[in-house]
Amino acid sequence: FEISVPNRADLPKGKKVLMGMIPRSSDELILCVDSDFDFLFADRTEQSREVNNARYMFHTYAYATENFLCYAPSLHNVCVKATKNDTRIFDFVRFMHEYSCTIYPLFLWYAYSAQLSSENVFPLIDFKSAVRIGYLDLADNGEKTLEWLRRNVAKREEMLRKRNPKMIEPMKEFEEQLRGRGLTPENAYLFMHGHTLMDNVVMILLNSVCEKLRAMSIAKITASKKQGVALKNEMANYTNSLRSIRDVLLDNENYTKCPLYKRLQRDIEKYIARTIWNMKRSGA
């Protein structure tokens, strides 16, 4: 089925609007939002308390839906759909594991800064510039790119520690709380700002890998025994079959094995089961 959104400029948008609707939420008004940091923060902020205790609000657990789209085990299939080439030339799972572990210290600083209502220790714009990857060197599964990132992260972390020495100890307790909510160095990318992950990390990877895969496919066609019109037709058929990488990523549905998605799925299943039970009990 398809849900059509009314095309009206005066409709209120955003999470703040939905937060204001929590008191009115019910079986007739179910709210669905990106978690942002609210799941991780548990009861550290007023908004996180509201989100985590709202009976009729479902949230992503991951920072946003973009993080699901960028689930590492699903990215190879994005390349296959975009290039029509299923050759595995890059291990996305291994790279994202290393990437996530690398940016983990800065993620903690950014998250800690975000939950402070009066201080702006490490704002989003600085986090973005520190964890983005400007390029991907495919050799050795991106190791040179990761080395470049590690140097940048180390410099930024050292600067933050020097500027904010009194925050180092409180951050240790903060980290323990976040780990209690399921955060690990390996899955930190699922909890980071979603558009930063998609636009400044994953799209860089996909563009580089897909460019190589397309070049491989074209080289294979060119090296075939076909000539003249037959060769032109095969080349045209291939290029016409290609899809926009971003469009394929936005259509990605292969994140259903992600543990955070499964948790959301269980929440919905429990709600449906509870609703059916209540309807039967009331004779509806």
Question: What residue spans do the PLM features occupy?
Answer:
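Acidic, divalent-metal-binding catalytic cores of TOPRIM
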Residues: F1-A284
